[in-house]
């Protein structure tokens, strides 16, 4: 099975896992998915992630809940393969007035919108998390 948009698949698996109250979700591994998982973990949206398996590695993301409610209220893809969205550093969006994050792919790697602003770089808006 080939995925046309692996990041949209990652976001959908997280959304579906949290709506079903799953402890963790697994998916095929890629460097970009691991980078997104690192950003989500550093910002406190997921509990942890791990890469399992040698021959066919899978990324396992441990979902996070607070008082029985999912920590991630909204996670959505912005830039997609058919329509890439790029923004300069002064055009980077603030999600929910700064309460959420935008995941940005920059020349310095994947980071949040706040980190990209402070680093003085823009890039492709991967998605919004709130």
UniProtKB/Swiss-Prot annotation:
Query: Which GO biological process annotations does it have?
Result: translation
According to the UniProt entry, its GO molecular function terms are: rRNA binding; structural constituent of ribosome
Keyword Transmembrane helix in the entry? The reply is no
Q: Which domain of life is it from?
A: Bacteria
One GO cellular component, as annotated: ribonucleoprotein complex
Keywords carried by this UniProt record? Ribonucleoprotein, Ribosomal protein, RNA-binding, rRNA-binding
Known function? One of the primary rRNA binding proteins, it binds directly to 16S rRNA central domain where it helps coordinate assembly of the platform of the 30S subunit.
HAMAP family found in the cross-reference section: Ribosomal_uS8_B
Q: Fetch the NCBIfam families from UniProt.
A: PRK00136.1
Indicate the quaternary assembly: Part of the 30S ribosomal subunit. Contacts proteins S5 and S12.
Family named by the database record:
Belongs to the universal ribosomal protein uS8 family.
Kindly provide the name given to this protein in its UniProt entry: Small ribosomal subunit protein uS8
Please name the source species: Pseudoalteromonas translucida (strain TAC 125)
Whichever gene encodes this chain, its name is: rpsH
